[in-house]
């Protein structure tokens, strides 16, 4: 069957528009994930990941992901995929993170490694291409890392991107485009964007201060100067403190014993402080001298800052003080629209139910604590009442004993 040219071009266009999905992981096949993910053996005490949907979730199966399970541990786990280069195309890295343990210090980011990585020896110093995701440590560090390896050096973003720090699942997305622009999204909403060259120090500055330029010696940057016609008044200088004129030597003051008496000093009401001449506009003022700039001879533009020869491994290489973080819904693609749709179909579908379950658990916990407090108070009141009753019984017995002792002498007299 022969196809018309317009139809053929249309089909080719549809084929070209299909997203390239380089890596996708949702952990929907039980323990089979252990066949795809490799634990590093670089250290013997790396923390263990387990498959879990956590203490609360929107869907028991869909929300299962890799959860850190041991406190105060480094973690090193990775999964490989068919190597690819992002040259000439958009790169989208996306995943969900849930810090249900109310994390105080720990990473929630991923690293993308080039081909050639020894997964069983992956560790903190293994060279990576991109590091992206949230990092929390105390109140001072709650940021989204976006780090690129450029010519062997890890370069951090110059902006501060705030991450989510609650207990719910959040969707993190990094988009790197072939025009050297980028975008960071959280929960499918843009939180930062811009130019790679502007927001990272990949390249030397375009302009530098002219090394041959210098501020002229007669350049006056003083906006105000002392009035040369102003002079200090003759009666200006007065001591700051003077002897108290109202003070009197005590009558019992013995100069042989106490020494010569000196009156206490007080603040001088006539003291005016340091004299300063009044200020006037400087007639020679030229403003702040600005060092002229020239083109930096060491600057050379790079149209391929965004590009890497190969991506082949996604790794979780991080430290956590308090475990419990769940990673899920990993996606690496070249299609921004597909990534947004995938996020809406995963995180977007279960987020409301997750919050409802957490709210229900919190309410149940609140009621349980109220009931426990009520029961504890009732027990304390019962114990107090029992103590009061015992005290009353003791007092009654003591009274009876005293009455018996009072009656005993009379009985003895009658017997006599």
Curated annotation (Swiss-Prot):
<dbReference type="GO" id="GO:0098794">
    <property type="term" value="C:postsynapse"/>
</dbReference>
<comment type="function">
    <text>Calcium-binding chaperone that promotes folding, oligomeric assembly and quality control in the endoplasmic reticulum (ER) via the calreticulin/calnexin cycle. This lectin interacts transiently with almost all of the monoglucosylated glycoproteins that are synthesized in the ER. Interacts with the DNA-binding domain of NR3C1 and mediates its nuclear export. Involved in maternal gene expression regulation. May participate in oocyte maturation via the regulation of calcium homeostasis.</text>
</comment>
<dbReference type="GO" id="GO:0005840">
    <property type="term" value="C:ribosome"/>
</dbReference>
<feature type="region of interest" description="Interaction with PPIB">
    <location>
        <begin position="237"/>
        <end position="270"/>
    </location>
</feature>
<dbReference type="GO" id="GO:0002502">
    <property type="term" value="P:peptide antigen assembly with MHC class I protein complex"/>
</dbReference>
<feature type="binding site">
    <location>
        <position position="128"/>
    </location>
    <ligand>
        <name>an alpha-D-glucoside</name>
    </ligand>
</feature>
<feature type="binding site">
    <location>
        <position position="328"/>
    </location>
    <ligand>
        <name>Ca(2+)</name>
    </ligand>
</feature>
<dbReference type="GO" id="GO:0009410">
    <property type="term" value="P:response to xenobiotic stimulus"/>
</dbReference>
<dbReference type="GO" id="GO:0005615">
    <property type="term" value="C:extracellular space"/>
</dbReference>
<dbReference type="GO" id="GO:0071285">
    <property type="term" value="P:cellular response to lithium ion"/>
</dbReference>
<feature type="repeat" description="1-4">
    <location>
        <begin position="244"/>
        <end position="255"/>
    </location>
</feature>
<keyword id="KW-0143">Chaperone</keyword>
<dbReference type="GO" id="GO:0005635">
    <property type="term" value="C:nuclear envelope"/>
</dbReference>
<dbReference type="GO" id="GO:0040020">
    <property type="term" value="P:regulation of meiotic nuclear division"/>
</dbReference>
<dbReference type="GO" id="GO:0051082">
    <property type="term" value="F:unfolded protein binding"/>
</dbReference>
<dbReference type="GO" id="GO:0044322">
    <property type="term" value="C:endoplasmic reticulum quality control compartment"/>
</dbReference>
<feature type="region of interest" description="4 X approximate repeats">
    <location>
        <begin position="191"/>
        <end position="255"/>
    </location>
</feature>
<dbReference type="Pfam" id="PF00262">
    <property type="entry name" value="Calreticulin"/>
</dbReference>
<feature type="region of interest" description="C-domain">
    <location>
        <begin position="309"/>
        <end position="416"/>
    </location>
</feature>
<dbReference type="GO" id="GO:1900026">
    <property type="term" value="P:positive regulation of substrate adhesion-dependent cell spreading"/>
</dbReference>
<feature type="region of interest" description="Disordered">
    <location>
        <begin position="350"/>
        <end position="416"/>
    </location>
</feature>
<feature type="region of interest" description="Disordered">
    <location>
        <begin position="193"/>
        <end position="277"/>
    </location>
</feature>
<feature type="compositionally biased region" description="Acidic residues">
    <location>
        <begin position="252"/>
        <end position="261"/>
    </location>
</feature>
<keyword id="KW-0703">Sarcoplasmic reticulum</keyword>
<keyword id="KW-0458">Lysosome</keyword>
<dbReference type="GO" id="GO:0005739">
    <property type="term" value="C:mitochondrion"/>
</dbReference>
<dbReference type="GO" id="GO:0033018">
    <property type="term" value="C:sarcoplasmic reticulum lumen"/>
</dbReference>
<dbReference type="InterPro" id="IPR018124">
    <property type="entry name" value="Calret/calnex_CS"/>
</dbReference>
<feature type="binding site">
    <location>
        <position position="317"/>
    </location>
    <ligand>
        <name>an alpha-D-glucoside</name>
    </ligand>
</feature>
<dbReference type="GO" id="GO:0031625">
    <property type="term" value="F:ubiquitin protein ligase binding"/>
</dbReference>
<dbReference type="GO" id="GO:0071257">
    <property type="term" value="P:cellular response to electrical stimulus"/>
</dbReference>
<dbReference type="GO" id="GO:0033144">
    <property type="term" value="P:negative regulation of intracellular steroid hormone receptor signaling pathway"/>
</dbReference>
<dbReference type="GO" id="GO:0016020">
    <property type="term" value="C:membrane"/>
</dbReference>
<dbReference type="GO" id="GO:0045665">
    <property type="term" value="P:negative regulation of neuron differentiation"/>
</dbReference>
<feature type="region of interest" description="3 X approximate repeats">
    <location>
        <begin position="259"/>
        <end position="297"/>
    </location>
</feature>
<dbReference type="GO" id="GO:0001849">
    <property type="term" value="F:complement component C1q complex binding"/>
</dbReference>
<dbReference type="GO" id="GO:0009897">
    <property type="term" value="C:external side of plasma membrane"/>
</dbReference>
<dbReference type="GO" id="GO:0000122">
    <property type="term" value="P:negative regulation of transcription by RNA polymerase II"/>
</dbReference>
<dbReference type="GO" id="GO:0033574">
    <property type="term" value="P:response to testosterone"/>
</dbReference>
<dbReference type="GO" id="GO:0001669">
    <property type="term" value="C:acrosomal vesicle"/>
</dbReference>
<dbReference type="GO" id="GO:0005576">
    <property type="term" value="C:extracellular region"/>
</dbReference>
<dbReference type="GO" id="GO:0048471">
    <property type="term" value="C:perinuclear region of cytoplasm"/>
</dbReference>
